[in-house]
Curated annotation (Swiss-Prot):
Keywords for the protein's UniProt record, in alphabetical order: ATP-binding, Kinase, Nucleotide-binding, Phosphoprotein, Transferase
Name of the top EC class for this enzyme: transferase
Family membership noted in the UniProt record: Belongs to the APS kinase family.
Alphabetized GO MF terms: adenylylsulfate kinase activity; ATP binding; sulfate adenylyltransferase (ATP) activity
Protein name per its UniProtKB record: Probable adenylyl-sulfate kinase
Superkingdom: Archaea
Organism from which the protein derives: Aeropyrum pernix (strain ATCC 700893 / DSM 11879 / JCM 9820 / NBRC 100138 / K1)
Active site (UniProt): 91
Gene symbol of the encoding locus: cysC
Stated role: Catalyzes the synthesis of activated sulfate.
UniProt keyword Magnesium, yes or no: no
GO biological process: hydrogen sulfide biosynthetic process; sulfate assimilation via adenylyl sulfate reduction; sulfate assimilation, phosphoadenylyl sulfate reduction by phosphoadenylyl-sulfate reductase (thioredoxin)
Pfam families given in the database record: APS_kinase
Binding site for ATP: 17-24
Amino acid sequence: MTTYKCIEKGIVVWLTGLPGSGKTTIATRLADLLQKEGYRVEVLDGDWARTTVSEGAGFTREERLRHLKRIAWIARLLARNGVIVICSFVSPYKQARNMVRRIVEEEGIPFLEIYVKASLEEVIRRDPKGLYKKALKGELENFTGITDPYEPPENPQLVLDTESNTIEHNVSYLYSLVKAVIE
């Protein structure tokens, strides 16, 4: 039986950035570190959400807002029960991220907005799912960074530059911030 460290209230760590910037990689590595220490951790990411709780959701502004509202409530419910919730979502609009923050913080749960930064040129080069290639050919509508805007956070708690720094460096930096908040 696994023994968990109990924290009264969890925390929501919200990673935002262009598709392919490294959000999910950072989220899963951070989760591994925290789980090894005995914390209860859940990673919520866009691929998982769009095949489960938001199956069939599209990519218009309205659909994205509705989708992220669902995720915010799931994160809030988990965090109020002592879970560290690491969310990895493009969440391209300032309006959406502010909505998520309000939903989480009205329960008194700490919310960390983390900007996973990579230039458009770099994420096009990486293109792990081939989505930029399709978007540039006009095969995908409302694709963030190509046919739909990404509004970078104005005052994130942390900026993780995945072009200039290694994954290990970025995870370590974020880990230190999370530990400072939960301890």
